[in-house]
Swiss-Prot record:
Claim: ATP-binding is one of the keywords in the record: yes
Gene that encodes the chain: queC
Organism: Frankia casuarinae (strain DSM 45818 / CECT 9043 / HFP020203 / CcI3)
Pfam families recorded: QueC
Protein name in the entry: 7-cyano-7-deazaguanine synthase
One record GO biological process: queuosine biosynthetic process
Known EC number: 6.3.4.20
Taxonomic classification: Bacteria, Bacillati, Actinomycetota, Actinomycetes, Frankiales
Matching SUPFAM superfamilies: Adenine nucleotide alpha hydrolases-like
Keywords: ATP-binding, Ligase, Metal-binding, Nucleotide-binding, Queuosine biosynthesis, Zinc
GO molecular function: ATP binding; ligase activity, forming carbon-nitrogen bonds; zinc ion binding
Protein family (similarity comment): Belongs to the QueC family.
Gene3D superfamilies for this protein: HUPs
Amino acid sequence: MNPTRGAVGGTDPRPAAVVLLSGGLDSATVLAIANQQGFACHALSFRYGQRHEVELAAARRVASALGVVRHVVVDIDLGVFGGSALTDPTIAVPAAGTAEEIPVTYVPARNTIFLSFGLALAETAGAWDVFIGASSVDYSGYPDCRPEYLAAYQAMANLATKATVSGERTLSVHAPLMHLSKADTIRLGLSLGVDYGLTHSCYDPGPDGRPCGRCDSCSLRERGFTEVGVPDPAGG
């Protein structure tokens, strides 16, 4: 096992992993899972042209609370391409249950782009494991959250970098929430000590950062906490 070099020097004997951290409920749970599995976690977040900074503030809170080797925030403006209500303020965020097929909150190729940054960070950090909070249960219908997509991405990743083609090891893309409902995810996170009051899930928060309570993400979150039988500490 190779030690992981930390952000401020020194070494960490744990194996390194990259965790994509949006600041939402799912990615916070995944960071807790990776920690529990014994990884030294490099959290990776993105300022990608989204409407608000509140999710990045949440990501910073979660990274600090759960403990990471370092937290990298990458600036990349996906809004220049348009095509999503999350990056284009002229496109309204639909209320839960009103979207047909793939909703306008889908950001074109977002997970492919984010995972590719994660792949680059993994190579430089000496990590062979990348974690993402994708789920095919209780989700908004995005094509890049499906298990077949992530399997294909992992296969590509192992053909794509100096580290993987050297034959020393293979890289694994982990989606530990893939087959969990939102309620099951919350139960798991609570058992691992996740403070969901630090997280943010809303697609269309108000100027003060408060969740809208009407978008698909708010609806899924509310239903999850209701099924678990505990109040949402974030008030969403």
